[in-house]
Regions:
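Long, low-complexity intrinsically disordered regions
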Residues: 1-138
């Protein structure tokens, strides 16, 4: 229910990546492949050398903050008995693929989306300060 407004508002704070940028390449690969675990996406983008992981993670973080990529699921490695173990690997995709294009492009301005979310926060958290609401919407 709240994703369209969240996405609309966040994308207004984080503009679409510039043409030819690494962020745009990441989005293009995800659009072509559908969804990939982080490790596969990193390799597909050529970030395979030493110290490349943290640089790549910074690009992913910016795209996630802007609502351009989301975690669809977590994939767990299997042991020799076929049982899941360890930490899950994030399966990344675009929200357009996961929720549909309409859910990412509502028929209202980013400011209207912000106001809707602010009203909801004020309803469910009535005793919080304006500073808290601002932090939640940041």
């Amino acid at each position: 229910e709240w994703w369209p407004d969240f996405c609309n508002y966040r994308r207004s704070l984080f503009p679409y990546p510039e043409a030819g940028s690494i962020e745009e390449t990441i989005l293009d690969i995800l659009r072509c492949e559908g969804s990939l675990i982080t490790r596969e996406l990193r390799a597909a983008c050529g970030f395979t050398g030493p110290r490349m992981r943290s640089r790549f993670d910074a690009y992913l973080t910016r795209l996630e903050m802007g609502g351009y990529i989301v975690t669809e699921d977590f994939i767990y490695p299997l042991d020799r008995h076929g049982r899941e173990y360890g930490w899950g690997w994030s399966l990344l995709t675009t929200p357009e693929r996961l929720f549909g294009r309409k859910a990412c492009h509502p028929d209202r301005s980013p400011q209207e989306s912000r106001e809707r979310m602010l009203t909801q926060f004020q309803k469910i958290l009535p005793h919080e300060s304006e500073k808290t609401y601002a932090a939640l919407l940041k």
